[in-house]
């Protein structure tokens, strides 16, 4: 029987282990035994807490999304202006912890799994909608609504695309370069729509 009060600790250890194993192997075709061994617990205990590998994988992607959401909320609260809010979201999307090799590999594996799993697809759609919505809050204060929608879609696509580039080990792009490219895109479109009225904050 698991020790009383240890469930949150063990569940987190299993989620962290799942992220490492998925990242190391670059696929979701991992076993509960491999994850349990990495977490330092028995497969039986892993099944006790999560029921199945699928449930553990869903908990793992929820953990990634939850961390990203919390970081975004904190960054937006610290922003003083709408333009700073947009920049804060861009920077959060390219934080160093999001660029860890195992995290990049896990995200790519989850995107692949979304072609088969309705729940994984649903969670990734929530992420995409949240990113777009958060960008729009800042952009709507800077340009007309239609333009804000278009800029938000483009910026979100750049964020996802530049992130995927990290999987190309032979052609990496730095965090700062990723931020700068996305900022350049936003700046160019804001200038086109606002005649340079909304300068970018220093990044």
Curated annotation (Swiss-Prot):
GO biological process: glycine betaine biosynthetic process from choline; negative regulation of DNA-templated transcription
Portion annotated as DNA-binding: 31-50
InterPro entries: BetI_C, Homeodomain-like_sf, HTH-type_TetR-like_transc_reg, HTH_TetR, Tet_transcr_reg_TetR-rel_C_sf, Tscrpt_rep_BetI
Gene3D superfamilies documented for this protein: Tetracycline Repressor, domain 2 (1.10.357.10)
Alphabetical keyword list: DNA-binding, Repressor, Transcription, Transcription regulation
Residue ranges of the TM segments: none
Keyword Repressor found: yes
Pathway(s) annotated for this protein in UniProt: Amine and polyamine biosynthesis; betaine biosynthesis via choline pathway [regulation]
SUPFAM superfamilies listed in its UniProt record: Homeodomain-like, Tetracyclin repressor-like, C-terminal domain
Pfam families: TetR_C_6, TetR_N
GO molecular-function terms, A-Z: DNA-binding transcription factor activity; transcription cis-regulatory region binding
HTH tetR-type domain span: 8-68
Functional summary from the UniProt entry: Repressor involved in the biosynthesis of the osmoprotectant glycine betaine. It represses transcription of the choline transporter BetT and the genes of BetAB involved in the synthesis of glycine betaine.
Protein name: HTH-type transcriptional regulator BetI
Organism classification: Bacteria, Pseudomonadati, Pseudomonadota, Alphaproteobacteria, Hyphomicrobiales
Gene: betI
């Amino acid at each position: 029987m698991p020790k009383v009060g240890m469930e949150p600790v063990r569940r987190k250890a299993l989620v962290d282990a799942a992220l490492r194993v998925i990242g190391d192997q670059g696929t979701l075709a991992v076993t509960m035994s491999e994850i349990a061994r990495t977490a330092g617990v028995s497969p039986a205990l892993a099944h006790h807490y999560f029921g199945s590998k699928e449930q553990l994988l869903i908990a793992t992607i929820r953990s990634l999304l939850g961390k990203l959401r919390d970081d975004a909320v904190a960054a937006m609260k610290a922003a003083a202006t709408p333009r700073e809010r947009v920049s804060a979201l861009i920077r959060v999307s390219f934080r160093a912890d999001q660029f860890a090799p195992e995290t990049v590999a896990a995200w790519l594996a989850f995107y692949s799994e979304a072609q088969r799993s309705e729940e994984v697809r649903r969670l990734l759609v929530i992420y995409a909608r949240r990113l777009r919505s958060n960008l729009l809050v800042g952009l709507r204060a800077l340009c007309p609504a239609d333009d804000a929608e278009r800029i938000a879609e483009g910026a979100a696509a750049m964020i996802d695309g530049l992130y995927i580039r990290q999987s190309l080990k032979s052609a990496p792009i730095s965090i700062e370069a990723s931020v700068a490219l996305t900022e350049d895109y936003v700046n160019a479109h804001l200038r086109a729509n606002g005649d340079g009225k909304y300068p970018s904050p220093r990044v």
